[in-house]
Amino acid sequence: MKLLVEKTNEKAIIPFQAHEGDAGMDLFSVEEITLKPMERKLIHTGIKIQLPKDTEAQIRPRSGLALKHGITVLNTPGTIDEGYRGEIGIILINLGSEEFKVEEGMKIAQMVIKPTLTLKVEEVVELTETTRGENGFGSTGV
């Protein structure tokens, strides 16, 4: 399978998998932006993508940014549908206690390509019973 990438900014870096077998590809900022504590901003990557048929791209945080600085992707995982052709933008939020500077060329998120299913939705009067039933939200312990 191929992921087609179009640069919309000369500073853009094409996403890649750092190691063989990695699920995610790093996404990079094309701009310098400062995020104050509890502030969120849209960060530009300078790329558009064309996904393979029957796939989606999930945008996820980078664990190092989250652990060391409290920087995460606000709507994680963000979903890019197969038919979307606009620039990929990443909504970052600073959950840390100090300002954080996003540098040009910095790895800001990761993109994972996943298969999608097209389902036929059917309304029913009642669902089948299970042993779990409606128990959720910590019902098996905290």
Swiss-Prot record:
Residues involved in substrate binding: 62-64, 75, 79-81
Record-level GO BP terms: dUMP biosynthetic process; dUTP catabolic process
Enzyme's top EC category: hydrolase
Cofactor(s) demanded: Mg(2+)
Coiled coil: none
UniProt key word Magnesium: yes
A GO molecular-function descriptor: dUTP diphosphatase activity
Domain of life: Bacteria
Pathway connected to this protein: Pyrimidine metabolism; dUMP biosynthesis; dUMP from dCTP (dUTP route): step 2/2
InterPro entries: dUTPase, dUTPase-like, dUTPase-like_sf, dUTPase_trimeric
Chemical reaction(s) catalysed: dUTP + H2O = dUMP + diphosphate + H(+)
EC number annotated for this UniProt entry: 3.6.1.23
Cytoplasm is among the record's keywords: no
Keyword line: Hydrolase, Magnesium, Metal-binding, Nucleotide metabolism
Stretch forming the signal peptide: none
Protein family according to the UniProt entry: Belongs to the dUTPase family.
Function comment: This enzyme is involved in nucleotide metabolism: it produces dUMP, the immediate precursor of thymidine nucleotides and it decreases the intracellular concentration of dUTP so that uracil cannot be incorporated into DNA.
This protein's name: Deoxyuridine 5'-triphosphate nucleotidohydrolase
